[in-house]
Each structure stands twice: as C-alpha cells, then as structure tokens.
Amino acid sequence: MENQPKLNSSKEVIAFLAERFPHCFSAEGEARPLKIGIFQDLVDRVAGEMNLSKTQLRSALRLYTSSWRYLYGVKPGATRVDLDGNPCGELDEQHVEHARKQLEEAKARVQAQRAEQQAKKREAAAAAGEKEDAPRRERKPRPTTPRRKEGAERKPRSQKPVEKAPKTVKAPREEQHTPVSDISALTVGQALKVKAGQNAMDATVLEITKDGVRVQLNSGMSLIVRAEHLVF
C-alpha cells in the first residue's frame, strides 16, 4: 500500500478540508459558521486520511475560525452548518458579539503593526540623512598665483557668463476625491477608494451593511469601512 502524502501546514489542511467538504469549508471568500462540536465530526470522518492527526485538525480549525473572512460570516441571522452543509441552528447573540470583538482586535493589531513599521522606516530614513550630511570633504588650499612682473601687460579679464535663475519646479497637484455622502446609493461591485491617512487605496464594494460598507482591497483583504472614509 502506498504511503499517503502528508499535509505539513494548517493552510494545507484547510485546503484539503475545503476540497473534501465543499459545502462546509471554503478556501477563499466569506466562510460559513461551523456547527458546534464539528471537531469530533472531523475526527470521525477523516480519521486516517492524509496522515492527519487530531493536533493538526485542531490547529487548522483554530486558524480557520480566527480568520477575518470567517469572523465576517459570524453575523446576526447566519446559520451554522455541518460537514455536509446541512443547517444546524442560527448563531446566538453572544457568539456574534464575540466574533465582532475578535475582528476589531485583529484590525487594531494590524494597524498598530503598520504604524510601527512606518515609524521604523522614518527613523531609518532620518538616520541615513544624518550619515550623509556628516562626512564633508576638506577644502583644498587654493594654489598661489605668481605675481605679475612690473611692466608686463595685464590680460583682460574674461567675463563670467550670467547665471540663470533656477526654474521653480511646481509641486504636483494633489489628486482630488469626492466623498461618499450616501452609502445607500452604492452598488455591489462598484469601484471606489478607501482613505488611509494621506493616501487612498482602490477597493470594490462587496456588501452594504448597517455599520458601513464592506469592501475588498486590491490586496484581497476585505473590511467594513464607514462612509467618511470612502471617496470616489
């Protein structure tokens, strides 16, 4: 009997589960809330397949249920599903609130990491600028010109060319954006931009919710944004 290939990471296990149970797991896009106690169902159904251990299944489930796309799917009115996609009851308010807090904390951690990275880049740029200014070349002494002998004719001084004033370079015009005043006028699939500080990132409308607009960035990340951060 040939040895079955072994899955080495939680992402590989999730991809296997999405292929094995397509009505329950998904490899991309919004995920459906899972049935409570689905871990034991997985152990019973995939025991021995792909040399999977309980530890690997538990780690993969933890990664899957803590992902942003899964937390987005845990919302009021959503229904839990079993391995075959059969409904297993609606989510209760406590689980929805817990998922919302997890999502907010995850977003806050990402923003803090980005701010820290930007601060380090600014510090590195400032340090590099100081190093460039520090070593200055020593000025060499000007060579002494011999004195003109008495009676020798003076050579006419050459006129220096008139230096032209440097042309002023116009600063590039800032790109003007129109703020979104009414999110109800937006449509799914519509292209717009998300303001992030002084920059605006391209995005596509995925869903209009009571808390704002869920958009997907070009990087593939999706998030809910309030109207004041959206522009055309």
Swiss-Prot record:
GO terms for molecular function: RNA strand annealing activity; RNA strand-exchange activity. The keyword 4Fe-4S does not apply. Its main location: cytoplasm. Residues 117-136, 147-177 have a biased composition (Basic and acidic residues). It comes from the Bacteria. Signal peptide: none annotated. Residues 105-182 are annotated as: Disordered. It is found in: Cytoplasm. Gene3D superfamilies: ProQ/FinO domain. Pfam families: ProQ, ProQ_C. Keywords: Chaperone, Cytoplasm, RNA-binding. GO terms for cellular component: cytosol. PANTHER family: RNA CHAPERONE PROQ (PTHR38106:SF1). RNA chaperone with significant RNA binding, RNA strand exchange and RNA duplexing activities. May regulate ProP activity through an RNA-based, post-transcriptional mechanism. This is RNA chaperone ProQ. It comes from Escherichia coli O1:K1 / APEC.
